[in-house]
Each structure stands twice: as structure tokens, then as C-alpha cells.
């Protein structure tokens, strides 16, 4: 096991990489489609229909490239989450296992964003061009994206963000407190095993609610939606636990403070 002084910088480096990747992901999924990062070539008349696009190599080639990037990300994200791989990385990296997973996920996502191929001449599922839709639809999408990202950041902070990023494991190890998940209740551990992506609805809003849903954006939204759907396995027991925790937190928030009590 590496000395504690080496564990802390490694965990912090992984967190900084993940944070920077998250900022870049906001730009990739929200700012670029909403604020017009990629100029279109020739307008809607230059776009092809869906049947013609399936026979055009200039569209199929970048589409296949983008598909490969997404499969690379999904494969890394799923493979490193497998129990055997987690056991192997825990054996050789110890408390840095989660930090390693986060860093590799951030690097895979960086590859997707950096080498993504837009398809400006491909067919679109919908496009807001005529007034008043050309003004109000982008504005509505922008508002929904802002709300979704605020909810995502809020949920991550509440959902033990330090443990998800691997910081808490190193912190507890340095202080000799053991594994942070070992201190959680069995019901909480069961929930975490079923729901390691606690921002599904908000992320789906970001992926699908855009003024123009082109070919490459449709591929991105569809595959990530499919992956998020398959990654969740909530049942009635999990929902009852979530409901009980929400009621407990609301009860604590509704209790008067000591200074306000009569």
C-alpha cells in the first residue's frame, strides 16, 4: 500500500480531472448545441433524408466513428464496474480503486468529446427554424438545461459526492476509519448497488431537449439513454427506502431551530 502522503495527491488529481471533464461535458452537451458551436453547411436544403443518409459514406463514416467512441466509453464504464475487475483493482490499488475508476471514466469521456465528429449535413429528427419557434424553443431549452444542471449538482452533493469521486475512501483510510460504505446501512448499500447514476432524469433532459436533434446528437442521446436505463435496477424496496429517507430529511428541515423554539 502506498504511503498516505502519496494517496492524497492521487485522489485529488483524479477529482480535478473528473471536475474538469464535467465542465467540458456541460459545454459539449449544452453550450455547443444551444449556442451554436458547429456551423451548418448550406441550411436545411443541404440536409439529406434518412434513407439517403444510410447510403452516404460521408455520413455513415463519422456516424460509425461516433458509435465507436460511445462504445469505448460504455465498455470502459461497464467493465471497470464489474465485480471481478473491481476486486482486481482493489487488490493492487487499494483505497485508490474508486479514484482509478473515476479517472479512467473521465479520460474515456474526454476521448468521446475531443474526437466527436459532428454531421451537419445529416438528417434531423426535429429542428426549430421558423419564427416564433426559432426564438422561443432555444430559450426554453436553455432554461431547462440550466435547471437540469443545477439539479444534477445539488443531487450529487446530497448523494455522498465525496464517496462517488473516491475522495472519502482515501480520507477515511488516512484517518484509520475503514471503508466509508461499511458505515452505511444495508438498505443504503442495496440502493447504491442499484443506483450509481442518481441524475438520470436530469441528464436525459439535457440530452434530448435541444432545438435541433441531428444525426450525431440522436446517436448520443439514444445510446446514453439506453445505457442509463439498463444501469438502473430500482425496485419497490429501494423506492420505500428513498421515500423514508426523504420524509426523514423533510422532518429534520421542518423542525424549529433551538433559537427559534419558544
Curated annotation (Swiss-Prot):
GO terms for cellular component: membrane; nuclear envelope; nuclear inner membrane; nuclear membrane. Keywords: Membrane, Nucleus, Transmembrane, Transmembrane helix. Disulfide bonds: none annotated. Residues 1-4, 81-97, 165-191, 235-262 are nuclear. It comes from the Eukaryota. It is found in: Nucleus inner membrane. It is a multi-pass membrane protein. The chain crosses the membrane at residues 5-28, 59-80, 98-114, 134-164, 192-210, 217-234. Residues 29-58, 115-133, 211-216 are perinuclear space. Belongs to the nurim family. This is Nurim. It comes from Homo sapiens (Human). The lineage of its organism: Eukaryota, Metazoa, Chordata, Craniata, Vertebrata.
Amino acid at each position: 500500500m502506498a504511503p498516505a502522503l502519496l494517496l492524497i495527491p492521487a485522489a485529488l488529481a483524479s477529482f480535478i480531472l473528473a471536475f474538469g471533464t464535467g465542465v467540458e461535458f456541460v459545454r459539449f452537451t449544452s453550450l455547443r448545441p444551444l449556442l451554436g458551436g458547429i456551423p451548418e453547411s448550406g441550411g436545411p436544403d443541404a440536409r439529406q433524408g434518412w434513407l439517403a443518409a444510410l447510403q452516404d459514406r460521408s455520413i455513415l463514416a463519422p456516424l460509425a466513428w461516433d458509435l465507436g467512441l460511445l462504445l469505448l466509453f460504455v465498455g470502459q464504464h461497464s467493465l471497470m464496474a464489474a465485480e471481478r475487475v473491481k476486486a482486481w483493482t482493489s487488490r493492487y490499488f487499494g483505497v485508490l480503486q474508486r479514484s482509478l475508476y473515476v479517472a479512467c471514466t473521465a479520460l474515456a469521456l474526454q476521448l468521446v468529446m475531443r474526437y466527436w465528429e459532428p454531421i451537419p449535413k445529416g438528417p434531423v429528427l426535429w429542428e426549430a427554424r421558423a419564427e416564433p419557434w426559432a426564438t422561443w424553443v432555444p430559450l426554453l431549452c436553455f432554461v431547462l438545461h440550466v435547471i437540469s444542471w443545477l439539479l444534477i449538482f445539488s443531487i450529487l452533493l446530497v448523494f455522498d459526492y465525496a464517496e462517488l469521486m473516491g475522495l472519502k475512501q482515501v480520507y477515511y483510510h488516512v484517518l484509520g476509519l475503514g471503508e466509508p460504505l461499511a458505515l452505511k446501512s444495508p438498505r443504503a448499500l442495496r440502493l447504491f448497488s442499484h443506483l450509481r447514476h442518481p441524475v438520470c432524469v436530469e441528464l436525459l433532459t439535457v440530452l434530448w431537449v435541444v432545438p435541433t436533434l441531428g444525426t450525431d446528437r440522436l446517436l448520443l442521446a439514444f445510446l446514453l439513454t439506453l445505457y442509463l436505463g439498463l444501469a438502473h435496477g430500482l425496485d419497490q424496496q429501494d423506492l420505500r427506502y428513498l421515500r423514508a429517507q426523504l420524509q426523514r430529511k423533510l422532518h429534520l428541515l421542518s423542525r424549529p431551530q433551538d433559537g427559534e423554539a419558544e
